[in-house]
Every structure is written in C-alpha cells, then in structure tokens.
From Swiss-Prot:
Function as written in the Swiss-Prot or TrEMBL entry: May be involved in the functional assembly of glucose 6-phosphate dehydrogenase.
Record's signal peptide: none
Superkingdom of origin organism: Bacteria
Record-given protein name: Putative OxPP cycle protein OpcA
Pfam family, one: OpcA_G6PD_assem
Native organism: Synechococcus elongatus (strain ATCC 33912 / PCC 7942 / FACHB-805)
Xref: PANTHER family: OXPP CYCLE PROTEIN OPCA-RELATED (PTHR38658:SF1)
InterPro entries: G6PDH_assembly_OpcA (IPR004555), OpcA_G6PD_C (IPR046802), OpcA_G6PD_N (IPR046801), Peptidoglycan-bd-like (IPR002477), PGBD-like_sf (IPR036365), PGBDSf (IPR036366)
Length: 445
C-alpha cells in the first residue's frame, strides 16, 4: 500500500463569492510572502486540473435514508453497505457495486419521492480529492460538485495545501483548491467561468468522473479548454458505447486518458516477457487464438488488452459478435497481415468476492492451431489461479505465469500516476482505434 503524504493546510476551505476567488487567492500568497515565519512557501507552477465529481450514487442513497456517511466519492465500506442494502430492497443481486441496474432503480426511487430532502451528510467532495492530487504539486485544483437540488445556486470555497515530503524542508511548494457546488443546471451555466479559472501558460487537465457526454455544454467547454480529458472506464456501465465516444473525441483532436488502462500494465509486461526469449519470438506471429476471462460486469479491461495486442501484431478486425449468456460471451475475429484468421473470446466470469474494480482481468490464454508453434501462453491472477485456462488445453506445453494484484489500483492513486505523464499515449490511442473498428462491426446473437 502507498503511504499518504502529510499535508500542511495553509488555508482551510473558506466560503467566498465567485467574483472574489482570484483576489482572495492572490491575497493568500501575498500574506505568505510577507509573513516571514517558518519555511518558505510558494505556489506551484506546474499544471491546473478540473475535477467533475457528480457522485449521484451517494447523494441518492443519502436522500433515500440508506447512507449516512460523508459525500466523498470514494465508495468505501459505508457506501458499499448502503448499495447492498438498496439492491436487496430492489430485488437485485446484493454485490455492493454501483452497476447500471442499481443506478436505474435508485433514480426511479428518488424521482418517486414527493419532496426532495435536504441532505445532512457532510459534503467532502473536493476536499478529499484535493488532498490526493495535492501531492503531485498542481498549481490549482478546481472541483465541480453538482448537487441534487434543482435550484441551488453556485457557491465557492477556496483553500490551499502544501505536501510535506521531509521534516526539514526549507521550502514548501503549495497548491490552490477551488470547490464549486450547485445544481446541475447552474453548473451548466458556468463552463466559461471554470475555464477561466485554469491558469494560462500551464498544462490543463480535466478528470471527468462520469461517462463522456459530448452533448453536454459543460463537457464541451471543458474539453475545448484543456490539454487532456481523464476518465476511468471501470465506472462505465456500457464501456463499448463509451469507447466509441472516446474514439470520436480523439478524432476531434481531444487528448483522452483512461485510468483503467494503467491497470493492465502487469498483464502487458508479462505478455511481452513471455515472448522475449529469442526461441519464442517467431511463435508470437503464429498466435491465432486468444481467450480472455474478466470479472463479469465490465469488459473494458478485456477490450483494451485485446486492442493492445491486436494493434501490436497488426491484426485487423473482421467481425464482433455478442452472444451473451451466463458468461456474456463476445466472439471477435481478426485478420493478420499474412491473411490468417485470429479468433478472440471475451468471457465475463461471475465472481463471488470481486475485487475493488469491476471488470479486472482474471486470466488469458494465447495459442495457435499450429501444433509446432511455440506460443502457448497462460497468464492468470494470483488470486484466482489458472485452472480454467489450463483446462482449456495444452497446460504442459504452455508457458504459465501468475500476475500479482496491484498494490493500489484506486482511481485516485492512478490519477497521481497519470499526472506524472506528459504528452499523448500513442500506444493507448492505437489500441483504442482497433477497439473502435471492431465495435462498429458489432452484432448480437
């Protein structure tokens, strides 16, 4: 597990009028420069980031009297317990996960309320996230926190934080945090204002903690004013549709980053290592069958792994068939550069005790119909083992590796990693392009 970096609070969240945000922050730094006490404090000059954090799940659960914790967007034990309770009430499988069926039932229950209750839960959106991002030394964090109240005007808070990496630091590099709260309708009206809060001359990022919505005015304004739109496809209830939207955005020269992509790193590295020995390199070109098992509920990681290996080996999508069933099977065919056919199967495996992220890879197998090809490779998660893939044939002649689970795969931790990367990720974009071509050929059984 990663150790949290302690933060010094220069200014606790302070309510302020929208028109006074810049003046207030300027005064904060002026006061620090003239205080003459303690370590030298200065504002970071790195990047600005907007975080759009709707967090409807916790708000609706709270409105229905099922959740009494903080609104923080982190989906900890209290949130999962409330979701499980709601699922039981709605007659849905009690997983504690925020899936699309649960969201639909919650929205219907909320809309059926005669009066929308005022929430008493402490709203920590913005504050909690600012602590996570502050360790990456941003210059300014702007958190957008829509509320369920249909007519709540926009309110603002400003604060400042300094990460402490050493007990004897002579200087501190600090960041500003601006949190805006209000109804969704009011949020739609301040897109230009939010864009102006992003400091000129520095990289600008937007973490959109929801599905991409190119038709939404706020989304459009932020996408046009930033260098990169960041998402996490593990949130998506229909990642296939959202991946097509991703590709459309990239085609329009919008730089996209998906935090879920980083969760594949160990699987990609072990795949590459399996074919690194000289005697196996030719075998890689003989691969014509790929089976991927993932935790049922979100095929995003499976699709991205498929797109990654297809883009590396020059496979072109030919067909994409959704068969459904217990394992939500998808059968995809590719054609290689030497005109051979490759069959790919994606299987969603029901898991009794799922991990932190919906849709994590469980296992995969690369094989060939050529019995002389040295390419059979099985990768499987340490937590589930390789039994199903080994039962699929050829365990004795396969190279088998276990993938250690990541030490920390929360969205917040991966965001910190993403902030250390500057520039476009060509490997991701090439993989997504293959996925998009395949998805546009999708048919259903």
């Amino acid at each position: 597990m990663t150790t949290a970096t302690p933060l010094l609070s220069l200014q606790k969240p302070t309510p302020i009028a929208l028109a006074e945000i810049e003046e207030s922050l300027s005064q904060l730094w002026a006061n620090q420069q003239h205080s003459g006490a303690g370590a030298l404090v200065s504002r970071a000059a790195t990047f600005s980031i907007v975080v759009y954090e709707p967090e409807e799940f916790q708000q609706i659960l709270a409105a229905l009297g099922l959740y009494h914790g903080h609104l923080d967007g982190l989906h900890g034990p209290m949130t999962r317990a409330a979701i499980a309770q709601a699922q039981t009430q709605f007659g849905l499988p009690s997983t504690g996960r925020p899936d699309s069926a649960t969201f639909k039932a919650l929205r219907q229950a909320y809309q059926a309320l005669k009066h929308s209750p005022s929430l008493t839960n402490q709203d920590l959106r913005g504050a909690v996230l600012s602590n996570v991002i502050a360790t990456q030394n941003p210059c300014r964090i702007v958190s957008l926190c829509p509320t369920l109240e249909g007519d709540r005007p926009i309110s603002a808070e400003v604060s400042a934080y300094c990460p402490i990496t050493s007990a004897k630091q002579a200087s501190l590099i600090c960041c500003e945090a601006v949190t805006l709260r209000g109804s969704q309708a009011e949020m739609e009206a301040i897109g230009t204002f939010v864009s102006e809060l992003l400091l000129p001359g520095l990289p600008r990022y937007v973490w959109w903690k929801a599905t991409p919505n190119p038709e939404q005015l706020l989304f459009q304004q932020l996408a046009n004013s930033c260098n990169c739109m960041i998402f996490d496809s593990s949130y998506f209830s229909d990642p296939e549709a959202e991946f097509l939207r991703f590709q459309d955005l990239i085609d329009q020269e919008t730089y996209i980053a998906d935090l879920n992509w980083h969760r594949l790193a160990a699987w990609q590295e072990l795949t590459a290592a399996a074919f690194d020995p000289p005697e196996r390199r030719d075998g890689l070109l003989e691969v014509d069958q790929l089976v991927i098992d993932y935790e049922k509920g979100n095929p995003a990681q499976a699709l991205m792994y498929m797109g990654w290996i297809a883009s590396r080996l020059g496979w072109q999508p030919v067909s994409y068939r959704c068969e459904g069933g217990e394992y939500d099977l998808r059968q995809i065919e590719f054609r290689t550069e030497d005109d051979r056919m490759v069959k790919v199967e994606l299987a969603g495996i029901p898991v009794g005790d799922p991990g932190l992220v919906l849709g994590d890879l469980i296992a995969l197998r690369l094989t060939s119909e050529n019995p002389d090809a040295d390419c059979c490779t099985i990768l499987c998660s340490e937590t589930t083992g390789c039994m199903r893939m080994e039962a699929g044939g050829g365990a004795q002649s396969c190279r088998t590796e276990q993938v250690a689970p990541p030490s920390n795969e929360t969205s917040e931790s991966l965001l910190a990693m993403q902030m250390q990367r500057w520039g476009r990720d060509a490997l991701y974009e090439e993989s997504l392009a293959v996925i998009a071509v395949a998805l546009r050929q999708r048919t259903h059984a």
